[in-house]
Amino acid sequence: MALFQEKLSSLSSSYSSIHSLPRILVSKPRNRIAVTKSRSICRASWQELAGVLVFSAIPFTAVKAIANSSIGVSLRRRLEEKKKEAVENSSRFKSKAQEARNDSKWYGKERPRWFGPIPYDYPPYLTGELPGDYGFDIAGLGKDRLTFDKYFNFEILHARWAMLAALGALIPEVFDLTGTFHFAEPVWWRVGYSKLQGETLEYLGIPGLHVAGSQGVIVIAICQVLLMVGPEYARYCGIEALEPLGIYLPGDINYPGGTLFDPLNLSEDPVAFEDLKVKEIKNGRLAMVAWLGFYAQAAFTGKGPVQNLVDHVSDPLHNNLIAMLQT
């Protein structure tokens, strides 16, 4: 997502350069994050790159070391003693969850459909067993069950990333506009643009505190891939991947559960948990659509989403999509 934002920012920079920055963004002192100019967008020091490589290898090394140690043996022995009971509890919970879905208005044959009361020949393979199933599949992407499960997994994954990314785009701008915390660059897409200009970001104004902040775009992309290999590999291996460390996850690949992935124990009540699944996918879909709006706003106005909202509320007749397209 970071790379896509950087590409978008480079396309929109020529347009945004003719717009003056909002006074609320310009007049504030930028004393929290230091920005310095580097020589190239591909600039990289071997010390920092080596540090990121070592840092990305720590999880693999730590897991392997613990699993092969006496501690790992003890953890696995303890897990084996409790696993039978845990599996039985998981089976009972899944049975109650199925009953909750049968009684819920969001699942099954009587669930809401995307055409509402209008008669429509909905795909027979969309049975309403998964959250957020409104019978919408005009392209027939879910005819094959394996493909359907894969796409559902992808949707959940992207929905969660979109919700997290939306917070990451909105919160810095809100803090900056309200004066809670001042950033050198609070607008999400301009951060990527600053990297394309070869700038170095030193977080909190502390010299040297930039992890990959002084690296070029290509090196940052490599770092992101390396740092994501571990979590993605564990997700690919399934929820059993943590059992060598004595961790049992009672759920499935989309909803692992357990203390590690559900520390607040939100899945304790099966009825509430099934409703939370629906709320999650609905809000995740809204977040993914919202990002399309963020991209469009950045390209057309050169501003962040919060500033665009402030402008629209202050003068809705002149600050809207139609007026923007007419100019």
Swiss-Prot record:
Annotated disulfide bonds: none
GO BP, sorted A to Z: photosynthesis, light harvesting
Tissue specificity field: Expressed in a punctuate pattern in cotyledons and leaves. Expressed in flowers, mature siliques and mature embryos.
Record's keyword annotation contains Transit peptide: yes
Pfam family, one: Chloroa_b-bind
Record-linked SUPFAM superfamilies: Chlorophyll a-b binding protein
This protein's name: Chlorophyll a-b binding protein 7, chloroplastic
Organism: Arabidopsis thaliana
